[in-house]
Design a protein with these regions (language model features):
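Core dinuclear metal-dependent hydrolase active-site scaffold
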Residues: 1-9, 102-118
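Cap/insert and terminal regions of metallo-dependent hydrolase folds
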Residues: 2-98
């Protein structure tokens, strides 16, 4: 309904979940269990595709996109590249978070510091 775009217009940081439909569909193809196939189909209805997440960030004119709750969570750099590929040419200023990602936004400036909790 556009509410995320409406309420995130011009923000410094948009924190958004994302699903890779391509990867989930590949998982469905190799799923040995009908129950898992159904789950992998159902989750596509209530998670935002990664491309749409980028479009929301672009159309809302956000400064930076932090992607959390990635479905499925990329397990290596190849999977991460496939997961993030739909953002190419749509929105380039993003970070894929994982456990331990920390965001610091100091008061008084527009700096966004993203690092890991050690």
């Amino acid at each position: 309904d556009g509410s995320v775009q409406k309420y995130s217009r011009g923000v410094d940081l948009l924190i958004h979940s994302a699903i890779s439909i391509d990867i989930v569909e590949r998982l469905r193809e190799i799923s040995p269990m009908p129950q898992l196939d159904k789950i992998l189909l159902d989750i596509q209805d209530y998670h935002t595709p990664i491309q749409e997440t980028g479009e929301i960030a672009r159309d809302s004119n956000v400064k930076h996109l932090l992607i959390y709750h990635s479905i499925p969570t990329p397990q290596n750099s190849i999977m991460e590249n496939v997961f993030l590929r739909p953002l190419e040419g749509i929105f380039e200023d993003y970070t894929l978070s994982d456990d331990g990602t920390r965001v610091i936004m100091p008061v008084g400036n527009s700096e966004i510091i993203i690092d890991k909790i050690q």
